[in-house]
Each structure stands twice: as C-alpha cells, then as structure tokens.
Amino acid sequence: MGQKVHPTGIRLGISKPWVSTWYASSKDFSAQLFGDHKVRTFLTKELKTASVSKIVIERPAKSIRVTIHTARPGVVIGKKGEDVEKLRQAVTKIAGVPAQINISEVRKPELDAQLVADGIASQLERRVMFRRAMKRSVQNAMRIGSKGIKVEVSGRLGGAEIARTEWYREGRVPLHTLRADIDYATSEALTTYGIIGVKVWIFKGEVIGGLPLVQEQEKPAKRAPKKAKKSAK
C-alpha cells in the first residue's frame, strides 16, 4: 500500500513555517523542546473550548513568547483580561522564564484544518452521523473559498463491530505539489465504542512567493490610522 508523508513536514521551510522558532545550544535543546511540549499540552487542555488552531512559541533572550491562534479570542482573554493573565502566570511557572502571551484571531475557521477536525470530532462525540458531519464540513469549506478538501474518519463508525475507514473529498488536494498550500490536521473523538480518528486536508491555493510570502500573510493586519475630523466653521 502507498504511504503518505506528513503534508506539513515535507513543506517546512518551503511554504510552511515552524511552530517553534528559537535557537539553542546542544545542552539546552532537549530541555527547551520538552518545555515547549509541556506548554502546548497545558494550553491545549486549558483552552479546549476556545477553538485553538495552533500555538506558536518563540524564545527571545531568556523569555518565552506564546502566540495563540484562536477563532474565539474573547474566551481566551476572559473578562478584563483575567484569564489570559492566569495563563501567562502558569506558562511562566512551567517554562521557568518570563512569559508573554499574544492572541491572534482566526478569521475563517471553516478553512482551518485543525478547527474543522476538532469540529467533526465534537459532532461524533455528540452522536451525529459521521457522513453528515463530514459532508457539512466539506460544504462549508468549499463555500468559503477552499480549492479542495478531503476528510477521513476511521474507527468503529456507527458502533460497527469491525473498524473501517471512510473519506469524502471535493475539489483537488495535490499532496505532491510542494508549492500547494495544504493545511493538514488530526483529531480524536472519544465515543462510547472507542476512539474515532479524524484527518483533514484543506487545499487553499498555490504559494508562488514561498515561505516569506506565507509569513507576511500570517502577520496580524495593522489598523489604518484614523483621519482627523475637520472642525466646523
């Protein structure tokens, strides 16, 4: 059987940026990598209901900067910023260095593979029929402007005795084209029959400018300065 390489891993440095961006000496590398893992695990667990897409970690000069990409920034920030301050204190304690937390809003959650996968998993846990959940997510993505999407679920679908895999695709998903912007994510649904795995591939178009163009597009948009009002004479 043909095996598939990880769509994000093969594009790192070409059209996909890393989610941890820092340099470390050989003696500190493993400790910092494990620290990143602990921070991500903690934040993913704490923000389970906040529709978190990804967590980007940077380590400038004996500190840690965490950027949380979420479709529901209000849930992360909390009332008057109370929740985000608690998260900052917790991350500082876990990482052992001063922490800064930034929030980046995901404008189109229907085109984010992680949010789509988590949404399907959530529906499966609520006993929604898997075909209906898959089809609804695919149709929403295509309506918003996706070039193509593929969704795959595997496990004891519908409580069947024998586990199987089913998938649904619309549009084109060119996995071998390195300039293709493929967003890939996985999730798990914990049902009474066992775990059902969910995989999502979303093709957003081709990136001609390479990694610098992608990084420029991912930066939060700057607000235009307000024009001075003319005084009425």
UniProtKB/Swiss-Prot annotation:
SUPFAM superfamilies: Prokaryotic type KH domain (KH-domain type II) (SSF54814), Ribosomal protein S3 C-terminal domain (SSF54821). One of its GO terms (cellular component) is cytosolic small ribosomal subunit. Residues 39-107 form the KH type-2 domain. The keyword Ribosomal protein applies. GO terms for biological process: translation. Keywords: Ribonucleoprotein, Ribosomal protein, RNA-binding, rRNA-binding. Belongs to the universal ribosomal protein uS3 family. Part of the 30S ribosomal subunit. Forms a tight complex with proteins S10 and S14. This is Small ribosomal subunit protein uS3. It comes from Pseudoalteromonas translucida (strain TAC 125).
